[in-house]
């Protein structure tokens, strides 16, 4: 199908995001965290750093387990119907105009970012003992967020086969770098081809991607740990935990939003 003028405008927005520098929010947190980073170096043990990193690795490794992908789409379908977008299944939504789907997807942002921030603030008050416990909750919220946004555009991202796509979105969110965004959009293109051809999505098959897929958890962990360990600093813990969780979930929402829109447009062009 040919893209409409509205579709082409969205494509330009995606390209702007793809080539942009790190977000203002990410830069602000890096600046604000400078004194905390100094305190971390002085007070946080290597064992604590390793524990947090391991928790991130453990969660991302569970994405090969089908039980981790449980997701109820009824709330998405109900929200779509309230907006005049009736659909019997999630897949039906991909036949709606993208200008109607964008507000539906954006409606998923606020609840998830607040939920993640509250979790980060609560565990931050508990200090070192609970910083690692915060990681599974944060990533569970963000996995569901990615699935919700994908569903808003008519693409049910359910099952371990979507692990490469989800990891690439997490990596784009955590790193904020252009190469990570490029990698995510390349993965989106593969997924779009699978959806358009009614084929099973298998992720990119090049040796280079297989190598990167193994490294993604490590890269995501590195980007987050430098910020998350600030929760172990006395008095700063709750504020740092809440702000970092809010930042990461907001970045995940934006990355998933752009990737889901790209998936919609790539699929549409192939039909």
Regions found by a protein language model. Give the residues of each.
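Internal active-site segments that recognize and position negatively charged phosphoryl groups
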Residues: 132-139
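Terminal, membrane-proximal amphipathic helices
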Residues: 1-119, 144-271
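Transmembrane alpha-helix interface/packing and boundary motifs in multi-pass membrane proteins
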Residues: 119-132
